[in-house]
Amino acid sequence: MTTWPPRIMRALEQFHATHPWDHNAHYHRWILRQLPRRLGRALDVGSGSGDLARLLASRAGAVHGIDVDPTIVDRARELTDPAAPVSFTVADALKEAPPGPYDAITCVATIHHMPFSDALTCFRHHLSPDGVLVVVGVYRPQPLSDYLIDAVAIPANVAMAWIKNKGRKAPRPASMTAPTRPATMTFADTVLDARRALPGARLRRRLFWRYTLVWHRS
């Protein structure tokens, strides 16, 4: 992912193994700012340990989280107050998502596990007429501009890990225990395919190897 010397990269990997922090949770508050203050129903695709789904419950009357990993879904249920308007399902979101419409659909660091265009089409189908889709995705660095962002992200990543963990070693949080795989699409390809499937979608490259996509159905 970078042109940094291997010795430095190994040292960084060792540091982050003992000072982990959730890059995806870093964007949760930003996601909330993209949504209306009140929602009827929300769907969180790739809900993991349920952190975002529980946050969405502060805005929505009902939140449904869906994930293919039964272990992490069990953990999400354990961490969620039974009185909260949140439910979780183990299923393939593209084939078995609870029928919409949804006023908001969120998908964080999950869409690269799916056929990208098919996923966007599916999400569009499940949105209400005035619904909003918010995606935080992962891309494969390719052009020089990606590596320049990478060069900024690496020291920022170390600083955030130190701040989040208050300088102490820590175990991996539950939200970081689900299986993952690297992204295969570049940001340029992501933008091209997204704007074909969702005309008017707003995409932006972000720090920590992420991009964001926001689309309002109207």
Predicted ranges, named:
Residues 22-40:
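Conserved alpha-helix/loop element of class I SAM-dependent methyltransferases that forms part
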Residues 40-46:
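Conserved class I S-adenosyl-L-methionine
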Residues 49-51, 55-95:
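Class I SAM-dependent methyltransferase SAM/SAH-binding core
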Residues 106:
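A conserved beta-strand element that flanks and buttresses the S-adenosyl-L-methionine
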Residues 114-123:
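A short, conserved alpha-helix within the catalytic core of class I
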Residues 130-137:
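Conserved beta-strand signature within the Rossmann-like core of class I S-adenosyl-L-methionine
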Residues 139-193:
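C-terminal alpha-helical "lid/dimerization" subdomain adjacent to the S-adenosyl-L-methionine
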Residues 180-218:
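Conserved Class I S-adenosyl-L-methionine
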